[in-house]
Amino acid sequence: MAQTPQLKTNRHDTHSTTTQGGSWSTKRIATLAVLCTVGFITSFIEIPIFPLAAWLKFDPSGIVALVAGFAFGPGTGVLVAVLTWFVHLLFVFDPYGVLMAILSLVSLVAPASAIYRHDLTLGGAVKGMVVGGLCSLIICVLANLVVTPLYTAVSISDVAAMIVPILIPFNLIKIILECVGCALIYKPISKALSA
């Protein structure tokens, strides 16, 4: 007797959000939602970390985006970073701060997680964080030169004068905190995500 081929369905209870070749399961979407929520909540934790520039603050949302990138790839990490800050913008209207946060995180998370994805070792993670950190540092300095004069009364020459004493040290400390935070929590979280 010939067997009847099974039909593929798009029923809501199949717990899949893609076709056979896709990789976005319901579990992955739920995990993404949780990561975005945690990123959003932590974006409101503002810690002054550099006494010379009390207006520049560190928030742990970058750690969440970096963990997402390491766990699911650069696209997901970037998505978590961008969604976190777009939602933040709905509650605190600060387009300048949001733009700077997105540029900072995307330039860190994308290269770091792309390198780690191709070398899933501690060495790959460290190399990714170093390259991502350098990219983020460069982007933050350049973006400050362009964006800050557009949104504030600070001139380009005043921003340029802040590069060495304020912008580079602050962003280095911020990047190190994000990378160390990710390194400390990534393994336990990745085990929980794969369970």
Question: What annotation goes with each model-predicted range?
Answer:
Residues 1-195:
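Loop-helix junctions at membrane interfaces
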